[in-house]
Design a protein with these regions (language model features):
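Functionally important transmembrane alpha-helices
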Residues: 8, 12-15, 170-229, 233
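Membrane-interface capping segments at transmembrane-helix boundaries
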Residues: 54-61, 232-252
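Membrane-helix interface segments
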Residues: 59, 71, 116, 147-152, ...
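Membrane-interface helix/loop boundary segments of multi-pass membrane proteins
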Residues: 130-156, 184-191
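Short, highly charged, low-complexity non-transmembrane loops/tails of multi-pass membrane proteins
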Residues: 239-271
């Protein structure tokens, strides 16, 4: 599954380090079909991840393709803001490390016209959706269902993420930084939607600001607004300790935090145990025994 979508990227990264990877260039004739290819690949990746996970009894929601949920099943908007805030901070920190250590990067065409901008936007969307769905959600949930330990899951997921960013050379260390934070956020909430959104806008902003510099200013203000929203939501939940804490989706068998063995982390099993306990308690009360 991973090789189907990322093997070519690993090879391209190696060619980039060797100085042999050609810079993509052209107009609508080249970038138009490439844009369609990126969007098609995105849809296929999500469909395959959902279908293969369903064969293992993991629903799309359990996989993480849904917003963060609170204990009552409602959408946890505050959790989403804080996830995005932490993800953005991780990308900034990781990006700084990569910038300091990188020995190479993917080339870009000298003329960045509308055709290239559209392609870059589609590629950014594909990166956010495909990477977080395959490299994060699908890989982590599969390893957890296989009974692998937390260190094994984290190491494998980070290694997969670093592999197709090999064109940075030593700068790939920065990728490991934000990849680790993304894994923590996913395990903590059981959702990848905020991570997809942040990843898309991070990559997209890098491309857009090269053509429209004012987008960088807008991105800064949006980042500040996100931080404020995250802090306000944290303060609001902290001031109301009586409210149930935000958690992952109730059906997240293999992704909800804390890390546990798959058999013990199945909420449906816990629910059945509680039901049996209540039934036994009622039987004892009917016979005059203490419940």
């Amino acid at each position: 599954m991973f090789a189907a979508f990322f093997a070519a990227g690993i090879v391209a990264g190696g060619e980039t380090l060797a100085g042999r990877y050609p810079v993509r260039s052209g107009s609508w004739a080249a970038f138009g079909p490439a844009t369609i290819s990126e969007l098609t690949m995105t849809g296929v990746a999500v469909a395959l991840a959902v279908l293969l996970s369903a064969r293992r009894g993991v629903t799309a929601r359990s996989l993480g393709l849904g917003p963060p949920r609170n204990a009552t099943g409602g959408i946890a908007a505050g959790t989403g803001f804080r996830m995005a805030m932490w993800a953005l901070a991780a990308l900034v920190a990781g990006g700084a490390i990569t910038a300091l250590l990188e020995t190479g990067h993917l080339g870009q065409p000298a003329v960045q016209d509308n055709a290239y901008t559209l392609y870059a936007t589609a590629a950014s969307l594909a990166a956010g959706v495909v990477e977080e769905t395959i490299v994060l959600a699908f890989a982590v949930s599969t390893l957890r269902q296989a009974g692998r330990t937390l260190p094994e899951v984290v190491i494998v997921a980070i290694a997969l993420r670093m592999s197709y960013h090999d064109y940075y050379g030593p700068g790939v260390v920065g990728i490991a930084v934000w990849a680790a934070v993304f894994i923590w956020l996913y395990l903590r909430t059981g959702s990848i939607i905020p991570l997809i959104i942040v990843h898309f806008f991070w990559d997209g902003t890098i491309f857009w600001t090269q053509r429209w510099h004012w987008i960088g200013v807008v991105a800064v203000y949006l980042s500040i607004a996100l931080i404020i929203a995250g802090l306000v939501s944290w303060w609001a939940e902290r001031s109301n300790r009586g409210r149930p804490r935000s958690r992952g989706p109730g059906t997240a068998t293999y992704t909800a935090w804390p890390f546990a063995d798959p058999g013990r982390s199945d909420p449906s099993q816990l629910d059945r145990q509680r039901e049996r306990g209540r039934d036994h308690g009622g039987d004892r009360r009917e016979h005059g025994q203490p419940a």
